[in-house]
Design a protein with these regions (language model features):
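Active-/binding-site microenvironments in catalytic and ligand-binding cores
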Residues: 1-304
């Protein structure tokens, strides 16, 4: 895609000024209270399944910046509580990096000096984000999730790194699974990334990964998707968009005000969907209340 074609696409799908809310919620406006209430009916058995990767603390080709985890207190420390002893630990992560399950806030991606809805690039400083922070989701993210399994629809084990997923793939997955993504939905796209990592040797995922083609932004806009997630960071690597390394991040976050869920894992939930004969479920996630944060680590839960 040429630079001019990309900028025209950005203009076409832009939601700037659409809801007259100062750019606070963006496409979350599609996820109304009524739609959240309707999604609760998808919880029938009470079974829950994590959609998160484990928080990894060891480096690898696919995990260049692992989380820090160390003990700050062991039970051999007498804290003056008699026979009661405590263990404590510290956890820290640069969670926007490869392999960490997380959510991106609007303040995570700037393009041409601006964030979503025209907020200036300078609104994010060393102290954090003055606008577009993750606090907008302090009450949680609850709604109907639709999982589209692209490798399943293609009849392959996974989408190869570097390959694009197109609108036609999403529509084919809908037909194969008997489901349709619609207004206010949390759309989840499985590429099979985690399966490939588990069955083959790890590789530098910064250099090659499967993801959405930029033109799928038209699908997201037409269906009025509220949140988008994938088992990669949603973008294809390497990018084939002239001058733009992360076109889906720009289109979704910067242009459309769609929060992104990166590096989820769907290998546990796919068998449950197959057994139930449905690819929709109640989705729940509670981002950390990081004041002025550009996102949050995340452990989303599918509820059946």
């Amino acid at each position: 895609m040429t630079a001019n074609e990309f900028r025209e696409l950005v203009r076409t799908v832009s939601n700037w000024g659409r809801w007259n809310d100062g750019g606070r919620r963006g496409a979350l406006n599609h996820l109304t209270q009524a739609r959240t209430a309707a999604a609760l009916r998808l919880a029938c058995t009470g079974e829950t399944v994590s959609l998160s990767q484990p928080l990894r603390t060891e480096a690898g080709l696919d995990m260049p910046e692992p989380a820090d985890h160390y003990m700050t207190m062991l039970t051999d420390v007498d804290v003056g509580s008699g026979s009661v002893r405590f263990a404590k630990d510290y956890v820290g992560a640069d969670y926007h990096n490869e392999g960490h399950s997380h959510i991106d806030a609007f303040s995570h991606v700037a393009f041409d000096g601006l964030f979503y809805d025209g907020k200036p690039e300078g609104s994010v400083t060393a102290k954090g984000a003055d606008a577009g922070d993750i606090e907008v989701l302090r009450n949680g993210l609850v709604g109907r999730a639709v999982l589209l399994d692209v490798p399943r629809a293609r009849g392959v084990r996974w989408v190869e790194p570097g390959e694009h997923i197109f609108r036609e793939d999403l529509e084919a997955a809908e037909r194969a699974q008997g489901v349709r993504a619609g207004p206010g939905d949390i759309l989840l796209i499985r590429t099979g990334h985690a399966r490939r990592l588990s069955e083959l040797e790890p590789w530098d995922t910064r250099e090659a990964k499967a993801g959405l083609h930029p033109t799928t932004a038209l699908f997201l806009a037409e269906r009025e998707i509220a949140v988008l997630g994938s088992d990669t960071n949603n973008d294809t690597a390497p990018s084939t968009t002239e001058g733009v390394a992360f076109p889906i991040h720009v289109l979704a976050i910067y242009a459309m005000g769609i929060h992104l869920l990166d590096y989820l894992q769907f290998e546990d939930v796919v068998p449950r969907c197959e057994a139930a004969g449905r690819w929709e479920f109640l989705f729940f996630a509670a981002p950390l209340r990081i004041i002025r944060g550009t996102g949050s680590p995340l452990n989303p839960i599918a509820i059946f």
